[in-house]
């Protein structure tokens, strides 16, 4: 295994609301290795995006707060840095493609102004030099007539085009860690493939670069990732290599996700689905998060309603459920 690029230890990110404290990320620990693509999958509300925002120190406070934990990057705990020190890392060393392209761009500034800003700040380029590089990046992500489009406003771009602009901005500085939160949202499958290839090119150009890919699309995960984290209820439920996860999923929730994928060889008229909906994080409590979605004998707690510890079921394959459920 390569050297660790980022170590996340016992991360807790909570949101304090009138209805109570939402434990959006609750005691999460994992490593990101140099040169790897690590995927985080899970349903909406599982804590995927909050985890990524925590790494970049972008949790809105109030109501959010990183309560405790460590985020170690280059032997430095990012949670100990000042606001200005974090600004020197954000965008240059750790970049992010945000989930909402329709609202992530400033509507009153031209695309060129927003793209040039990061280059002027981190590389001390003048306006002309920054514009030239920004045009090259727009062309690289497949935006036609980039010399013209760079002087247009966000409302003149479609949702898919705005997403490509966001991706171009994130790749401007060849970051060590690219956090991609649903990077192919609003894109058709052809452009999805182009964007994923572009992200892989970044990793190939910079041998020690890593990608944290957040998605709900297991097909994208299978195509791009080296390892996968499955999240639910603000906690990690399973971690494994991509081959191991698809070949031998251990957690009941992971198995249910896999069974919900349509397969060509299966002649079924109806897709399998998990029972119910993801409950509010406020209503999950500290016990087992799955009791409302599984029958007691199939639930990770096996009917005890107690939350389970994450343990190593086999080498580099971690799972959070009763040990009696595991057959490796």
Predicted regions and their residues:
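ABC ATPase NBD coupling module
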Residues: 78-95, 121, 244-249, 279-285
């Amino acid at each position: 295994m390569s050297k660790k690029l980022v170590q996340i230890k016992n991360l807790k990110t909570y949101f304090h609301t009138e209805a109570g404290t939402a434990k959006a990320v609750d005691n999460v620990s994992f490593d990101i290795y140099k040169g790897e693509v690590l995927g985080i999958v899970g349903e909406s509300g599982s804590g995927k995006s909050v985890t990524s925002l925590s790494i970049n120190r972008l949790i809105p406070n109030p109501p959010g707060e990183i309560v405790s934990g460590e985020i170690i990057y280059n032997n430095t705990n990012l949670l100990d840095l000042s606001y200005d020190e974090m600004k020197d890392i954000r965008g240059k060393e750790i970049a992010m493609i945000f989930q909402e392209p329709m609202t992530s761009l400033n509507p009153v500034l031209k695309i060129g102004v927003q793209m040039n800003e990061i280059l002027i700040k981190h590389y001390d380029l003048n306006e002309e030099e920054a514009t030239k590089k920004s045009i090259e990046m727009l062309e690289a992500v497949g935006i036609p007539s980039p010399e013209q489009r760079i002087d247009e406003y966000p409302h003149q771009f479609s949702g898919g085009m705005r997403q490509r602009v966001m991706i171009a901005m994130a790749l401007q500085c060849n970051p060590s860690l690219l956090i991609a939160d649903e990077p192919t949202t609003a894109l058709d499958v052809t452009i999805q493939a182009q964007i994923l290839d572009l992200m892989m090119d970044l990793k190939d150009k910079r041998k020690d670069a890593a990608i944290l890919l957040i998605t709900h699309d297991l097909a994208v995960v299978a195509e791009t990732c080296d390892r996968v984290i499955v999240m639910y209820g603000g906690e990690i439920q399973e971690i494994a290599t991509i081959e191991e996860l698809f070949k031998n999923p251990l957690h009941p929730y992971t198995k249910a996700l896999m069974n919900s994928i349509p397969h060509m060889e299966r002649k079924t008229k109806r897709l399998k689905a998990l029972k119910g909906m993801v409950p509010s994080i406020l209503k999950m409590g500290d016990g087992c998060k799955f009791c409302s979605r599984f029958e007691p004998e199939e639930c990770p707690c096996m009917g005890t309603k107690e939350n389970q510890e994450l343990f190593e079921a086999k080498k580099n394959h971690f799972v959070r459920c009763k040990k009696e459920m595991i057959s490796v």
